[in-house]
């Protein structure tokens, strides 16, 4: 079984059936991660390249591990020391990679649409590791895999996304994916951090955390970037925490046993209280493991064999 597409650029373009296929394929991949010997030869002879124009630890490492566990060769392009610094365009870099026989490229770039440009330029599969404020599809898929694993599905679930919605590619991809799978999505944060057009994506908008969290099944907490405060988008980090930090008291407003997610890295004491981050309802460490499984599934479905 393979995805009937060359690339993974975003969840906006995926059907519910394709999302389900990815999540179903990730389950046996996670079983592989639980073995003493994690390597399988599925992608032996394939070359997977990571090309990150923005800093990343989790996503880049997760993709590289996923490729290695599947038997592929990997190469990481360090943009700070590559021809990119000499003015080489994205298209030229892509053509160079194609000439090397690359099978898949994972790209993270500050410019929205960069993965799509790359995908139009080369025959290799392109996977979006995050582009500007546009999408971060693999983060959303690992979030969804975690939800499905813990809660069994999506139909009728109430999911709150808490924090800086305006600048978050994680939020956008989660919204596209969750709404397609039948979940009710609520976004909550300061008015200055919620884009006015977000309701057009079929979400409910809240500016009060207590109202938004009532009766939800999942709370996905987004990282607050300190530079947003310097731009005057909220008065201070202390004020943000007072109104929007996920504390044990606010968590009690959700359904008993509600799941807590965070894409990382966390600002403890600002967007999430340490007691919540380390509590029994948090699946933050599991998200990291699930990220490797989901990325293994994607590489298999895009560049693996037909069987």
Curated annotation (Swiss-Prot):
Q: Which molecular-function annotations from GO does this UniProt entry contain?
A: amino acid binding; aspartate carbamoyltransferase activity
Q: Which pathway is it part of?
A: Pyrimidine metabolism; UMP biosynthesis via de novo pathway; (S)-dihydroorotate from bicarbonate: step 2/3
Q: Which GO terms of the cellular component aspect does the record hold?
A: cytosol
Catalysed reaction(s) here are: carbamoyl phosphate + L-aspartate = N-carbamoyl-L-aspartate + phosphate + H(+)
Tell me, what does this protein do in biology?
Catalyzes the condensation of carbamoyl phosphate and aspartate to form carbamoyl aspartate and inorganic phosphate, the committed step in the de novo pyrimidine nucleotide biosynthesis pathway.
Q: How does it assemble?
A: Heterododecamer (2C3:3R2) of six catalytic PyrB chains organized as two trimers (C3), and six regulatory PyrI chains organized as three dimers (R2).
The name under which this protein is listed is Aspartate carbamoyltransferase catalytic subunit
């Amino acid at each position: 079984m393979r995805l009937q597409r060359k690339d993974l650029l975003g969840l906006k373009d995926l059907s519910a059936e394709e999302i389900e296929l990815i999540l179903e394929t990730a389950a046996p991949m996670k079983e592989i991660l639980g073995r003493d010997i994690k390597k399988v030869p599925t992608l032996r002879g394939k070359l997977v390249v990571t090309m990150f124009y923005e800093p990343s630890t989790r996503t880049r490492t997760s993709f590289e591990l996923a490729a290695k566990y599947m038997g592929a060769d990997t190469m990481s392009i360090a943009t700070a020391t590559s021809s990119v610094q000499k003015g080489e365009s994205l298209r030229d870099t892509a053509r160079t990679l194609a000439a090397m026989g690359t099978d898949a490229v994972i790209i993270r770039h500050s410019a929205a649409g960069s993965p799509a440009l790359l995908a139009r330029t080369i025959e290799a599969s392109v996977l979006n590791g995050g582009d500007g404020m546009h999408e971060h599809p693999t983060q959303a898929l690992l979030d969804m895999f975690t939800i499905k694993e813990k809660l069994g599905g999506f139909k009728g679930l109430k999911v709150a996304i808490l924090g800086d919605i305006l600048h978050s590619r994680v939020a956008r991809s989660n919204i596209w994916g969750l709404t397609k799978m039948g979940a009710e999505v609520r976004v909550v944060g300061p008015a200055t951090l919620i884009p006015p057009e977000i309701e057009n994506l079929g979400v409910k908008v809240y500016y009060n955390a207590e109202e938004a969290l009532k009766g939800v099944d999942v709370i996905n907490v987004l990282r607050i970037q300190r530079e947003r405060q310097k731009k005057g988008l909220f008065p201070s980090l202390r004020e943000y925490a007072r109104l929007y930090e996920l504390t044990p008291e606010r968590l009690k407003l959700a359904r008993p046993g509600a799941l807590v997610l965070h894409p990382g890295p966390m600002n403890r004491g600002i967007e999430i209280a340490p007691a919540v981050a380390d509590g029994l309802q948090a699946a933050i460490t599991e998200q990291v493991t699930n990220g490797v499984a989901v990325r293994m599934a994607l590489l298999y479905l895009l560049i693996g064999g037909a069987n």
